[in-house]
Regions:
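N-terminal export/assembly segments and adjacent metallocofactor-ligating motifs
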Residues: 1-190, 227
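Gly-rich Lys/Arg/Thr-decorated short loops/hinges at beta-loop-alpha junctions or inter-strand turns
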Residues: 10-21, 118-124, 208-219, 303-309, ...
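N-terminal leader/propeptide and maturation segments of large enzyme subunits in energy/redox metabolism
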Residues: 15-26, 185, 189-228
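Generic, well-ordered alpha-helical scaffold segments in large soluble proteins
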Residues: 35, 39-43, 72-76, 145-148, ...
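Flexible, glycine/charged-enriched surface loops at secondary-structure junctions
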Residues: 47-51, 193-198, 245, 276-283
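A cross-kingdom feature strongest in bacterial/archaeal respiratory oxidoreductases
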Residues: 51, 117-164, 172, 305-397
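Conserved short loop/turn motifs at secondary-structure junctions
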Residues: 55-62, 223-226, 249-256, 288, ...
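A glycine-rich, hydrophobic/aromatic-adjacent loop/helix-cap motif
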Residues: 229, 238-333
Length: 397
C-alpha cells in the first residue's frame, strides 16, 4: 500500500482535459467544481435528470461512505442509471440471495475456522485473497482445514493456483449447474438430505427435489466431464462431513447460469444441514450490518428498477454495466449524456470496451474520481483525485 500511497503517477490534483488535444492540465478545485456544476445543470435542463449516469468500480465497494453517497447522489437526481462492478462478477450471487432469503445483501460465507469439508466452485483465493468474505491469511486458513484432518476440494476447469494445493475436480466450463444438480440428485436418491431440517426451514424444497432427480450423474457426466462415480463420492462425502461449507466465487458467476449456480451452492448447504451453522455457511456479523444499511438506503432491491434498454432488473440498485455503451448512444428519453465514474475502469473490465470507449467521446460531460489515469478516464473532461483508505475514516465492509 505504501507504493500506491506515494506513487509519483498518482493523481493528487484536479485535472482538466482539452478535448481538442486530449491533454490534461492541472486546475484548481474551485475551477473544476464550478465548471462541472454548470455543465451538469445545462445537461439536466436540456435532457432531464435521467440523462445522468454513474459507474463505480470494485475499490469503491470497500468504502462505506462512497457507496452510500454515490447512491444518494443518484437518488437525489432521480436517475436510474446507477452501475457498479458487481454485474461483472457477483450480481447473480446477490440475485440468488434475494430469491432465497428475501434480501440480496444476505450472503453466507464459509466458516473456515471450524469447517471440516470445504467445497469451492470457481474460486481462486490464493490469488484473490478471498472474495465476498474477509479472511486474513486465507492461504494459512485453507491449509489449516487439512492440517486438522479436514478436506478442501476445488472445482474448477483450470488447475488454478489454489487447486494445485488441494483436491481438484476439473469440470468443463459453464457446466457447474449440471454438476451441482447431480450432487443434489445423489442426496435425494440416497436419502442423504436432511429432510427434517428442510421441511422446517424452507418452502419449495419438494420442487427442487423433483428437479434434481432429473439430473443423475450418469446422464450429466458427458456434459460436465466429471465421472459419475467420482461425483457420487463427492456428494456422499459432503453429506457425511461433520461440518461442511460450499463456496462459489467469480468463476461460478461468469457463465450463462450464474444465478442458478449461486442458488444451488446454497441449496447444497441447506440440503445437508450446513447453512447458518458453525463450520458451514454462516451469515457473518460485520462492523456494518449491510442488510440493514442497504434497506435503509433503498439499496436492498432486486428488480425494483428495469433498464431502459432490454428491461433488465437492478440488483442492489445497480443495472448491468454491459449496457453502458448502448445507453450512451441510443437516442430517446433517458439516454446518458453526463457520466461519472469512481474507482473504476469499465473500458477495461466491462464487455465491449472499445464500444464504450467510443461512446464516452460523445458525452456532454464525463467526470472521473480516481487516483490514477486509466483506459477509461483518459476520455474524461475532469479527473478529480480521491483518497486512499489511509486518508479517510472508514469501516471494513
Amino acid at each position: 500500500m505504501t507504493d500506491v500511497q506515494n506513487d509519483p503517477d498518482r493523481v493528487i490534483h484536479p485535472l482538466r482535459r482539452d478535448r481538442a488535444t486530449g491533454e490534461f492540465e492541472r486546475v484548481s478545485w474551485e475551477a473544476a467544481i464550478a465548471d462541472i456544476g454548470a455543465r451538469l445543470r445545462r445537461t439536466i435542463a436540456a435532457t432531464g435528470p435521467n440523462s445522468v449516469g454513474w459507474y463505480f468500480g470494485n475499490p469503491g465497494a470497500f468504502s462505506y461512505s462512497h457507496a452510500l453517497w454515490v447512491k444518494g447522489f443518484m437518488e437525489g437526481l432521480g436517475s436510474p442509471h446507477y452501475y457498479t462492478a458487481s454485474s461483472q462478477d457477483v450480481a447473480n450471487r446477490f440475485a440468488a440471495s434475494a430469491l432465497l432469503y428475501g434480501s440480496p445483501a444476505l450472503v453466507p460465507i464459509p466458516d473456515l475456522h471450524r469447517t471440516s469439508f470445504l467445497l469451492m466452485v470457481g474460486a481462486n483465493p490464493f490469488v484473490s485473497h478471498g472474495s465476498v468474505l474477509t479472511a486474513p491469511k486465507i492461504k494459512e486458513q485453507l491449509h489449516g482445514i487439512v492440517e486438522r484432518g479436514g478436506r478442501v476440494v476445488v472445482v474448477d476447469p483450470r488447475r488454478s493456483e489454489t487447486a494445485r494445493h488441494f483436491e481438484h475436480v476439473p469440470v468443463r466450463p459453464d457446466t457447474d449447474a449440471w454438476m451441482l444438480l447431480s450432487m443434489l440428485c445423489v442426496l435425494v436418491e440416497e436419502h442423504l438430505a436432511d429432510e427434517a431440517s428442510l421441511a422446517r426451514e424452507t418452502t419449495g424444497w419438494a420442487r427442487v427435489r423433483e428437479l434434481a432427480l432429473g439430473f443423475p450423474p450418469e446422464e450429466t457426466a458427458a456434459r460436465t466431464g466429471v465421472p459419475a462415480d467420482e461425483l457420487r463420492r463427492l456428494a456422499r462425502d459432503l453429506a457425511g462431513a461433520d461440518r461442511a461449507a460450499v463456496y462459489g466465487r467469480t468463476g461460478s458467476c461468469l457463465g450463462r447460469f450464474g444465478t442458478l449456480v449461486s442458488f444451488l451452492l446454497d441449496t447444497l448447504m441447506l440440503a445437508t444441514g450446513n447453512l447458518d451453522r458453525a463450520g458451514g455457511g454462516v451469515f457473518g456479523l460485520p462492523a456494518i450490518a449491510l442488510d440493514e444499511v442497504a434497506q435503509q438506503a433503498g439499496l436492498d432491491t432486486y428488480g425494483k428498477v428495469r433498464s431502459r434498454l432490454g428491461g433488465f432488473p437492478d440488483v442492489l440498485g445497480a443495472l448491468p454495466a454491459s449496457l453502458l455503451a448502448e445507453e450512451m448512444t441510443t437516442p430517446g428519453d433517458g439516454q446518458i449524456r453526463a457520466f461519472f465514474t469512481s474507482a473504476g475502469n469499465p473500458v477495461l473490465s466491462c464487455p465491449d470496451g472499445p464500444a464504450l470507449e467510443q461512446a464516452l467521446e460523445g458525452l456532454d460531460l464525463y467526470v472521473s474520481l480516481d487516483i490514477y489515469v486509466n483506459e477509461t478516464n483518459r476520455h474524461a473532461d475532469y479527473i478529480l483525485p480521491s483518497t486512499t483508505w489511509l486518508e479517510r475514516d472508514d469501516l471494513p465492509i
